[in-house]
Amino acid sequence: MTKGPVRLDVGVSYALPRTGLPSSVSFRKWVAAALKGRIREADLAVRVVDEKEGCSLNHHYRGKDYATNVLSFPAEMPQGLPKGVKMPLLGDLVICAPVVAREAAEQGKSLSAHYAHLTVHGTLHLLGWDHEDDKEADAMEQLEREILAELGIDDPYAGER
């Protein structure tokens, strides 16, 4: 665990009208909760997109012909940095607003809680967490539960198993 103050720069952009979407302050709070005790300095971008852009990105980067709720793009360290130099750029999150809204309604979750969950989930991917097998998924889901509980948000996986 990392102790001490955290320097966090979260840039948020919206590719559709902001009405009903979380504020940049909310996204920053959720990212900060996911990073708390794990990293001391981070720059990342969050882009909220429509279904067309979400589908295009998911097709281009994952070969899937549908929009997904969140995509994580970890930053790559540039070549030639001196040994030991760390770059604070963590990466980018792309969140597809129509998919998030549809899932929240289908799952009976508040829209804000679902955005918080997916922001935490995507941020953990930027930190290297994954869910390719059951053991990884269980560990990542437990960490998500703990982070969301600190934010006062109910277990997003309750009732799934």
Curated annotation (Swiss-Prot):
PROSITE patterns tied to this protein: UPF0054
Requisite cofactors: Zn(2+)
One cellular component (GO) term of this entry: cytoplasm
Pfam families with a match to the protein in the record: YbeY
Predominant cellular place of this UniProt entry's protein: cytoplasm
Subcellular location: Cytoplasm
Keyword rRNA processing belongs to the record: yes
Enzyme Commission number(s) from the entry: 3.1.-.-
Homology family: Belongs to the endoribonuclease YbeY family.
HAMAP family the record matches: Endoribonucl_YbeY
Protein name, as recorded: Endoribonuclease YbeY
UniProt source species: Xanthomonas campestris pv. campestris (strain ATCC 33913 / DSM 3586 / NCPPB 528 / LMG 568 / P 25)
Gene: ybeY
